[in-house]
């Protein structure tokens, strides 16, 4: 109940407008794979091409060794969950879940076994006689997921399935979806624009922009060593600063120097762009004045962490995230000195098109960098 999905040189266009150009991708059997990117990047278009709902202008799509370009969507054995749930309002929970099995002429005995199994798996068995209007958004999404999985598809496709839920329920549902996917082991392709959601559920993520894959890898790799500046700014928060590179010495904010021993492209020198995550700054408690000099503009207390908004001597604005202290918050106008571990800094070419450091793990086939 799982397949490898392979895409070779896919193209999708609407008239003269190219949505996806020469995209290749290899999704592993049983993998939870997420297409992540801003609106209009082509992620839903690609998902619909896999499903058979959009035409394929060029390229080949495979489930294992079987080419599916011309295969009717109904014969691809996919389960699909949409943003708007798409469950039938006139049917009970149980009737919604059994719908696909009835269409496949499954025997009543087998149908009952499978329906009971998935109602329990989704923790909605106590609601089996309820109509959808009497369910919460999370419960309706569980019904949609049960209906998609009960037919034992080879692939599960999910298009922004949590976007209509409130923040707390989204966290609960993404945890449930990941647990269910792990227990079943089905190849899952998930579309979202929410980077935190993507990192929480995915085995691997393809970060997309303008129909191209910018970075493909595990969430940790993408967050810690993004392939280019777009990926760095799209995945989580980061501070983007100007820098100057001379050999292994990186100068930040005009004065602060860091010695780097992990430069891969040693031909790069002069102006570069630097990315530092807010949580990677360390405020020098001893005020030794050998760090980056900054001035606190404001702060926001968020329980576990306090977010400080500050500016450097260069005038560049930054955000600093520190673990909250019981006794104090740094006041507005205070002068602080910041340090950062050299391995926590990312350095990009001046145009932001690529990371020049070692340790960038990018599985993208025919990698296209930001222009």
UniProtKB/Swiss-Prot annotation:
InterPro entries: AAA+_ATPase, ABC_SmlMolc_Importer, ABC_transporter-like_ATP-bd, ABC_transporter-like_CS, Mo/tungstate-bd_C_term_dom, NA-bd_OB-fold, P-loop_NTPase, Transp-assoc_OB_typ2. GO terms for molecular function: ABC-type ferric iron transporter activity; ATP binding; ATP hydrolysis activity; transmembrane transporter activity. The keyword RNA-binding does not apply. It catalyses: Fe(3+)(out) + ATP + H2O = Fe(3+)(in) + ADP + phosphate + H(+). It is found in: Cell inner membrane. PROSITE patterns: ABC_TRANSPORTER_1, ABC_TRANSPORTER_2, FBPC. GO terms for biological process: transmembrane transport. It is an enzyme of class 7 (translocase). One of its GO terms (cellular component) is plasma membrane. Its main location: membrane. Residues 5-235 form the ABC transporter domain. Belongs to the ABC transporter superfamily. Fe(3+) ion importer (TC 3.A.1.10) family. This is Fe(3+) ions import ATP-binding protein FbpC.
């Amino acid at each position: 109940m799982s397949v490898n999905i392979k895409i070779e040189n896919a193209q999708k266009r609407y008239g003269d407008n190219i949505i996806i150009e020469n995209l290749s991708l290899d999704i592993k059997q049983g993998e939870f794979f997420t297409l992540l990117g801003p609106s209009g990047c082509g992620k839903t278009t690609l998902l619909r091409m896999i499903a058979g709902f959009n035409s394929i202008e060029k390229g080949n799509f495979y489930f294992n060794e079987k080419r599916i370009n011309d295969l009717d969507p109904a014969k691809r054995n996919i389960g699909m969950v949409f943003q708007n749930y798409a469950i039938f309002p006139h049917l009970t929970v149980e009737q919604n879940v059994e719908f696909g099995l009835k269409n496949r002429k499954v025997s009543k005995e087998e149908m009952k076994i499978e329906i009971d199994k998935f109602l329990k798996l989704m923790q909605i068995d106590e609601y089996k006689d309820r109509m959808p209007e009497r369910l919460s958004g999370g419960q309706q999404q569980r019904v949609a997921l049960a209906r998609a999985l009960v037919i034992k598809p080879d692939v599960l496709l999910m298009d922004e399935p949590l976007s209509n839920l409130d923040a707390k329920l989204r966290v609960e549902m993404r945890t449930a979806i990941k647990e269910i996917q792990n227990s079943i082991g089905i190849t899952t392709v998930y579309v979202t624009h929410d980077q935190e959601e993507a990192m929480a559920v995915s085995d691997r993520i393809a970060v997309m922009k303008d129909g191209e894959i910018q970075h493909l890898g595990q969430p940790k790799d993408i967050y810690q060593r993004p392939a280019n500046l777009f990926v760095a700014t799209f995945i989580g928060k980061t501070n983007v600063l100007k820098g100057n590179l001379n050999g292994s010495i990186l100068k930040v904010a005009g004065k602060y120097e860091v010695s780097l021993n992990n430069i891969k492209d040693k031909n790069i020198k002069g102006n570069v762009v630097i990315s530092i995550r807010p949580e990677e700054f360390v405020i020098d408690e001893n005020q030794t004045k050998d760090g980056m000099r900054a001035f606190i503009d404001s702060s926001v207390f968020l329980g576990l962490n306090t977010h400080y908004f500050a500016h450097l001597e260069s005038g560049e604005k930054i955000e600093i995230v520190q673990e909250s202290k019981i006794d104090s918050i740094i006041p507005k106008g205070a002068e602080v000195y910041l340090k950062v571990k050299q391995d926590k800094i990312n350095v990009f070419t001046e145009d932001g098109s690529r990371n020049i450091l070692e340790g960038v793990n990018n599985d993208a086939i025919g990698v296209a960098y930001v222009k």
